[in-house]
């Protein structure tokens, strides 16, 4: 299974195009354009597993830095400020990592 089994390759490409320049990544815009915001809880858990590179069950800042590359390998890395903003947007319990439930809440907010 690949990420394009869940999301359209065209939607992913369009979402990445919108944030190709550093410091232009806006999570909610990315979620909408890529189609993530329309996904069910089950589909988002599948997406979360793709993003969770080390399969630890949560995303840390190191994994978030490569968030865009999980959708397309040649995409850019998130900047430090983008990574921090993404963490702040989802880390509801302040433990420095994002669980699957927190990810789902962020995408659907």
UniProtKB/Swiss-Prot annotation:
SMART domains: EFh. One of its GO terms (molecular function) is calcium ion binding. Found in tumor tissues and not detected in normal tissues. Gene3D superfamilies: EF-hand (1.10.238.10). Keywords: Acetylation, Calcium, Metal-binding, Repeat. This is Oncomodulin. Ca(2+) 2 binds at residues 91, 93, 95, 97, 102. Residues 82-109 are annotated as: Disordered. Residues 94-109 have a biased composition (Basic and acidic residues). InterPro entries: EF-hand-dom_pair (IPR011992), EF_Hand_1_Ca_BS (IPR018247), EF_hand_dom (IPR002048), Parvalbumin (IPR008080). SUPFAM superfamilies: EF-hand (SSF47473). Ca(2+) 1 binds at residues 52, 54, 56, 58, 63. Residues 39-74, 78-109 form the EF-hand domain. The keyword Calcium applies. Belongs to the parvalbumin family. Has some calmodulin-like activity with respect to enzyme activation and growth regulation. Binds two calcium ions.
């Amino acid at each position: 299974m690949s990420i394009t089994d869940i999301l359209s390759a065209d939607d992913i490409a369009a979402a990445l195009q919108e944030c190709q320049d550093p410091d232009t990544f806006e999570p909610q815009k990315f979620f909408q354009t890529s189609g993530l915001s329309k996904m069910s809880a089950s589909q988002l858990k599948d997406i979360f597993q793709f993003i969770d590179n080390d399969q630890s069950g949560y995303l840390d800042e190191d994994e978030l830095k490569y968030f865009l590359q999980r959708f397309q390998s040649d995409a850019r890395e998130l900047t430090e400020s983008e990574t921090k903003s993404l963490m702040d947007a989802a880390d509801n319990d302040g433990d420095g990592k994002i669980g699957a439930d927190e990810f789902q809440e962020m995408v659907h907010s």
